[in-house]
């Protein structure tokens, strides 16, 4: 599997397929709205400076849950678009329509898809406990350190401020250590289950669906020996992800269809290799 050729094919398809942008219109709009409605960095800094670690943990949990809900809704539309692309690549449909972005909400797909996504995310959450705990500690201590530094007159730190920063630095180191360990543990699992949504679609069409856990097991089997390939595909999009961040999501008009077209092509090529 050549990832460079895969990405080049995805870019070519973006130019050649009419209606591709329309297929991803809803998730792009949701992403833009969520970016504009999110908390500012200044507000977060002031809040973290006035609370203890327990309160910061509750805030991060609530923000994380809100983010998960938004991501879940976005994922339903993106999965719908991906299913339409699968049919297009297999010549089971001739053109894309806006209604294809709602495929996941059909009676046949919605319940199995929600169950599969729920099981997948629950399993990944369990694998990511260290990552979540480390993230909360790192974010909390980082904002505390920044707040202390910004409150210093003319950026001249007093001995007390230096001591406070030193104490928080130890917590920051612990948080970053937990994040690193969490990533080492959770990333292989994330990629092991990365093909579950596509496998579910094929099982539903073939009449072989036997429940979400069977879908997840099939994804683990399919990804044996290819988790590194999928990881490198994601790494190749880091520059595009940074561009999306810098443009508050506006670059997603191009980037989101590009990334997910590549993901569908990856699945199609992987499925062919595994036959």
Feature names for model-found ranges:
Residues 1-275:
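Hydrophobic alpha-helical membrane segments
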